[in-house]
């Protein structure tokens, strides 16, 4: 066992040869490297698989022995200062390593087909492998300096992948937005690290925790300064895990390829913030105010993310806000001191969300056969619908992921989210009420995404409905109800579909978009699949290739069974509790790790009832009678203009505007922060050029003109110079005489 731990340092470096060799190959032998590009995908999967096997072996040993291993190399600069580098293997490290490798392998296999048509195929796999290296280095770090180095590398890789299609202005802006937003958090993280080094004199986790606890117990620290440093450390996690108020980069990060959306949102970048807070939990728990602050940020993010997901049209953006909300649950659990529940939800959510993102990628891939490569159309749920019979495997997998995130047993997220919801009652009834209400919202918006995507009719080919219309112009709002007659065609928040009497209707035009040439002539992926690729444009979507479906099917297995890690069987300690021993739990300090099945069943029925209510509301608004457009006469019979209905419409539109406009937070930042910074920069530029540079330049210019005037008056004659000389001397003497008189 000791020998296994001694070689654990190799974990972060195994995937590293792939990006290095791809880079050298493209520089030295570009033609040969590109012609053998399938080989690089295979190598990426192979090396990450070796890391996965090694991580699983370490995890099994930790479950059996609850061991923690740390190895440190010391680089002594002088007698007073030395740098130490090493690796730390504990339950948190092994959990994160397994998450990163399992999700990473499946995303790489999926990407081989998804990115096969892209000219940046090799660049994509180089970024992905380096991303895995950076994240594995982060979770195995033994001190804050290493954490910060790999933290920045993880951020760099995510920026490169978000802006992967950098020729698209939207993707370039999204990359810039992610970079600037994370700079705020990363700067706070750096200041916090330096602050705690100033307090304790150490970057190593063990020494840091021990010294700091001694200082706290002896009351030898300034609590205000300590709290400030802790808030700065937490600021890095706020930005990385897209917590309020630094969450604004996450929805725009969907501009990157869909596979990287799955990896970033499931097991890498956004999970890094949760990992950091979990790693520093022994530091935070002795600072009560920071724990309260963490839980406050978590509960705000939980509710905000859910409300912003309610009316999104882009399928990936809706899932992004869902990720934000679920990360809020994890942060809430950490703030409450429920360490096990937070990590449990991190595990279950990672696989469920990866399943949903890869499923959405399969849908987008199939929609591109109809609308061409246009993210505004291929990702628009309003143009989807009726995909059940065209992509049945994707549909069923997406349904399982949806039900898991809704909290329906026995799927993965039910077990972990239920723990957090139950613990919230022990912490704060107000927080618990918000958390439970958000569980219903989660069920609503996830079911809404599923229904808009797969149920009803394929809206790209929507034919006119049968039945008599009472007015010549209708609009079907995103909420699923018939709207009033609309005259302003540019009103974006309500008008989603306009139908004229006895006319065939389409969202954009009545032509079928052709697939781009480089999409049709795809290069075969490294897994050989027979009869791959359609050579003709289809009028309907078709199921994705087996190479894309294989990772989805594996994620279904994880979604079905990974939740059983945290279930108590026969009153024994569950696997997750044994894995995390010793664990931190401020809410169950005297717990004997047994479970009261009556209490569990009562809480489970309550949570499932709330989720079922959200699902029912979503079905009521989006299922058949509204979404199929087959019986508008029945709808019209229920629609009565009354003051009560007008009031409800106002509430509905206000909620819709709030959600669709991202809570106006982006607009606030754009108006006050971005515009203010631009004006400040313009003023600074003006002050620098006109005032700072203007004064010496003005003095020099004035001296030049005075010299020119004097030179012209003198005329070049010595007698004139002598005359002016004696005149100025006389004037000076007179002034001096009268001043001293």
Curated annotation (Swiss-Prot):
Name of the protein described by the UniProt record: NAD(P)H-quinone oxidoreductase subunit 5, chloroplastic
InterPro entries listed in its UniProt record: NADH_UbQ_OxRdtase_chlpt_su5_C, NADHpl_OxRdtase_5_subgr, ND/Mrp_TM, NU5C-like, Proton_antipo_N
Cellular component annotations (GO), alphabetically ordered: chloroplast thylakoid membrane
Keyword Iron appears in the UniProt entry: no
Keywords tagged on the record: Chloroplast, Membrane, NAD, NADP, Plastid, Plastoquinone, Quinone, Thylakoid, Translocase, Transmembrane, Transmembrane helix, Transport
Annotated Pfam families: Proton_antipo_C, Proton_antipo_M, Proton_antipo_N
Record's keyword annotation contains Membrane: yes
Function: NDH shuttles electrons from NAD(P)H:plastoquinone, via FMN and iron-sulfur (Fe-S) centers, to quinones in the photosynthetic chain and possibly in a chloroplast respiratory chain. The immediate electron acceptor for the enzyme in this species is believed to be plastoquinone. Couples the redox reaction to proton translocation, and thus conserves the redox energy in a proton gradient.
EC number in record: 7.1.1.-
GO molecular function: NADH dehydrogenase (ubiquinone) activity; quinone binding
Residues that span the membrane, as ranges: 9-29, 40-60, 89-109, 125-145, 147-167, 185-205, 219-239, 258-278, 283-303, 327-347, 354-374, 396-416, 425-445, 549-569, 605-625, 721-741
Location(s), subcellular: Plastid, Chloroplast thylakoid membrane
């Amino acid at each position: 066992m000791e020998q296994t731990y001694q070689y654990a340092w190799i974990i972060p470096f195994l995937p590293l040869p792939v990006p290095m060799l791809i880079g050298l190959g493209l520089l030295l032998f570009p033609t040969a490297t590109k012609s053998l590009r399938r080989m690089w995908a295979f190598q990426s999967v192979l090396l990450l698989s070796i890391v996965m096997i090694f991580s699983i072996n370490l995890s099994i040993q930790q479950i059996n022995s609850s061991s923690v291993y740390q190895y440190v190399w010391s680089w002594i600069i002088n007698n007073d200062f030395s740098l130490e580098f090493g690796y730390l293997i504990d339950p948190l490290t092994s959990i994160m390593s397994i998450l990163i490798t399992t999700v990473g392998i499946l995303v790489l296999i999926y990407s081989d087909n998804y990115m096969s048509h892209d000219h940046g195929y090799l660049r994509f796999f180089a970024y992905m492998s380096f991303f895995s290296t950076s994240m594995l280095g982060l979770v195995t770090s033994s001190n804050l300096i290493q954490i910060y180095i790999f933290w920045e590398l993880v951020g760099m890789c995510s920026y490169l992948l978000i802006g992967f299609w950098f020729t698209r202005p939207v993707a370039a802006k999204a990359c810039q937005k992610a970079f600037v937003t994370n700079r705020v958090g990363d700067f706070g993280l750096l200041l916090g690290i330096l602050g705690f080094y100033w307090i304790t004199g150490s970057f190593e986790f063990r020494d840091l925790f021990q010294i700091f606890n001694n200082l706290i117990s002896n009351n030898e620290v300034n609590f205000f300064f300590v709290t400030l440093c802790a808030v700065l450390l937490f600021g890095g996690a706020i930005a990385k895990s897209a917590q309020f108020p630094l969450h604004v980069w996450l929805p725009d990060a969907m501009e990157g390829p869909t596979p990287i959306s799955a990896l970033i949102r499931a097991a890498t970048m956004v999970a890094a913030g949760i990992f950091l807070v979990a790693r520093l939990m022994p530091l935070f728990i002795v600072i009560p105010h920071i724990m309260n602050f963490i839980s406050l940020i978590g509960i705000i993010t939980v509710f905000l993310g859910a409300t912003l997901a309610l009316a999104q049209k882009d399928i990936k953006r809706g899932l992004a806000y869902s990720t934000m909300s679920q990360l809020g649950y994890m942060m809430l659990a950490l703030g409450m001191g429920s360490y096990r529940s937070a990590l449990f939800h991190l595990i279950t959510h990672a696989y469920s969300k990866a399943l949903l993102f890869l499923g959405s990628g399969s849908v987008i891939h199939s929609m591109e056969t109809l609308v061409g490569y246009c993210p505004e159309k291929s990702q628009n749920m309003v143009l989807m619908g009726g995909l059940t019979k065209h992509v049945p495997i994707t549909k069923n997998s997406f349904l399982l992921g949806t039900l898991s995130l809704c909290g329906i047993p026995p799927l993965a997220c039910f077990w972990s989210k239920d723990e957090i919801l139950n613990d919230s009652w022990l912490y704060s009834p107000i927080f618990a009420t918000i958390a439970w209400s958000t569980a219903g919202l989660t069920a609503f918006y996830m079911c809404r995404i599923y229904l808009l995507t797969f149920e009803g009719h394929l809206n790209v080919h929507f034919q006119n409905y049968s039945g008599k219309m009472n007015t010549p112009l209708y609009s079907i709002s995103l909420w699923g109800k018939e709207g009033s007659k609309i005259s302003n065609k540019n009103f974006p928040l309500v008008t989603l579909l306009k139908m004229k009497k006895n006319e065939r209707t389409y969202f954009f035009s009545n032509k079928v978009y052709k697939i781009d040439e480089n999409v049709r002539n795809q290069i075969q992926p490294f897994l050989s699949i027979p009869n791959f690729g359609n050579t003709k444009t289809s009028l309907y979507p078709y199921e994705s290739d087996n190479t894309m479906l294989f990772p989805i099917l594996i994620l279904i297995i994880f979604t079905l069974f990974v939740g059983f890690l945290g279930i108590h069987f026969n009153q024994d300690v569950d696997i997750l509790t044994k894995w995390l021993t010793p664990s931190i739990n401020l809410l169950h300090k005297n717990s004997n790790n047994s479970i009261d099945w009556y209490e569990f069943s009562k809480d489970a029925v309550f949570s499932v009832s709330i989720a079922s209510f959200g699902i029912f509301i979503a079905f009521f608004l989006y299922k058949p009678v509204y979404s199929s457009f087959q019986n508008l006469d029945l709808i019209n019979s229920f629609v009565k203009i009354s003051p009560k209905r007008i009031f409800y419409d106002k509430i509905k539109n206000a909620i819709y505007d709030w959600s669709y406009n991202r809570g106006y937070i982006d607009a606030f930042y754009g108006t006050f922060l971005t515009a203010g910074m631009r004006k400040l920069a313009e003023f600074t530029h003006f002050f620098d050029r006109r005032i700072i540079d203007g004064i010496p330049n003005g003095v020099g210019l004035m001296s030049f003109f005075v010299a020119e005037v004097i030179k012209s008056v003198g005329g070049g004659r010595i007698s004139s110079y002598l005359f002016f000389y004696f005149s100025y001397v006389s004037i000076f003497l007179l002034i001096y005489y009268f001043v001293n008189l």
